Amino acid sequence: MYRMLIKQDLSKYDLSSIHHATTAGEALNPEVFYQFEKATGLRIHEGFGQTEMTLGIANLYGANIKPGAMGKPVPGYGIDIVDPDGKSVEDGVNGEIVIRTDPKPTCGVFLGYYRNQEATDAAWHDGMYHTGDVAWRDEDGYYWYVGRADDVIKSSGYRIGPFEIESTIMELPYVLECGVSAAPDEVRGQVVKASIVLVPGTEPTEELKKEIQNYVKQHTAPYKYPRIVVFRDELPKTISGKIIRNKL
């Protein structure tokens, strides 16, 4: 919803009754934060949680917000970021978000899936609940979302998070929505694919594809640019509005 709102002329509407804005469920690109605040004067408070837990990471009311960051761990949650061996990673390094249960389980976190011990064992092991979400932590303790572990693109030995590429593409004024996924490639294993919904009235041309590719190269890293760009009328989503990347 926020992504679509910032592409509209919000000055035509009376939004004076709105005092706070929050978001959860899917990470918002930094450009959305900037444009929404510019149009409304409101700062969006983002948070991270799952069906299996309550709000575990958040930009709580009164805290300093870093646009694009999920925030900091909520008090009482043993949030950490670990590598595939379950060891804590340093600041700035991607890893899986986990909840440590030592010395005791955290209130508000599920203990298992109903009649599914296999799924429970996959999520709960080594004294931690494994969320399956990848993020990194900055030097100020803020957590930044990268993507689901199974959404990370492995290309020529590089591990590329789709969210960073989506955020960069969303900075372009003619992009309404964007979903980044992996596409199979015989040489690189996988390559970055960007599925894009353009703002109404924008012509989907080959020149526009090249412009998008060059923009990503210039604002991230050359190996991260989408080698495949497709324009679509809409993106596949869940009932809650999340983009389904494995259907792109």
Where are these regions (language model features)?
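AMP-binding/adenylate-forming catalytic core of the ANL superfamily
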Residues: 101, 106, 119, 134-223, ...
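Glycine-centered tight turns that cap/initiate beta-strands
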Residues: 17, 41, 76, 174-177, ...
